[in-house]
Amino acid sequence: MKMGKAERYIHEKLERDGGLLLALIDPDKQPFEKGAKVAEACAEGGADVILVGGSIGAQGLILDKTTKMIRERVNVPIILFPGNVGTITPYADAVYFMYVLNSREVYWVSTVQIQGAPVVKRMGIDPIPTGYIILEPGKAVGWISNANLIPHSRGDLAAATALAGEYMGARIIVTDSGSGAEHPAPPELVRAVKSVLTVPYFYAGGCRTAEQATGIIKAGADGIQVGTALEFEADLTKVKEKVKSMSHAIKEAGREKLKSQPKYEERSLIWPLFRAPSRLFKMPAMPKFNVPKFEFKREQIEQKLAEHKKIQQIEAIKARVHAKLKSKKRK
């Protein structure tokens, strides 16, 4: 499966900045205009991606209308962070096509994905294969997913689970302590997880300050998802300022991290048994993604919705005709 537009955008931003801020809007807690205004403040403050989703209630009309309103106000990718098969809307650019790696129930590992795959394909939004790992305390998402929570003290278990996710095909790994977690996971756990991965790694849960964001990025995370830290700010100016300070801290730590990473030529000399020295074999340059500015194709979505409505109307007419014919036969 080829990378979609949103996934290419993520890789391009990481190559340039070394870290991303992903702002989460939960339509159940921030519906309609309220959620759209918060998303706009986040985008203006420097959020790289707007995530939309939640564990409870983020579906149906509330999800559709809120996401559409957000789309009209921001010009960054909107990625769905689904809580179930109902958390899908055509007004987003992409969806975390997630499986909960440490759930005790097969539903969250494969069944819900089977239910959701045809819907994602019909809507034409880009799926991003995502391995999702729930850490303690887990909060609502841990309870709903019936997760075998990974303790913050066991970075080795988190790393092994993340590695399994990548081997199973995940192109993004997310570890989440749960919405409303009192504090983020320790740097040791973040470092352990990132040390085994070659795909982008995002941390979520408990990160509320620029200082905490700096520590998480320095420990190795490629991005931080923030939701609860923005939910309780009624003043949109304060939301914007908070996002701006966290975004600045993430970008600063990310660029420092990029500087400290060895180049491909240097790596080839460190591990000569596995990679030919650069004087014998020069590694090709990494491809750079020229991602165009995000523009939402409203016409395509409206056309799909109109076609779907026509199909429903035709089915309704068929049903009425069938009912009339059936009643005439009985007479």
Feature locations, PLM:
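N-terminal amphipathic alpha-helix/helix-capping segment at the start of soluble metabolic enzymes
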Residues: 1-25, 119-130
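Glycine/Thr-rich beta-alpha phosphate-binding loop at enzyme active sites
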Residues: 53, 143-190, 230-238
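C-terminal helical cap(s) of enzyme catalytic domains, especially alpha/beta-barrels
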Residues: 67, 229-258
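Short beta-strand/loop segments at the ligand-binding rim of alpha/beta enzyme cores
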Residues: 17-23, 67-82, 195-204
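Catalytic cores of alpha/beta
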Residues: 80, 84-97, 199, 203, ...
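Conserved anion-binding
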Residues: 87-166
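Active-site mouth loops of central-metabolism enzymes
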Residues: 19-35, 82-84, 137-158, 202-208
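Glycine-rich phosphate-binding active-site loops on the catalytic face of alpha/beta enzymes
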Residues: 51-57, 98-109, 177-179, 206-207, ...
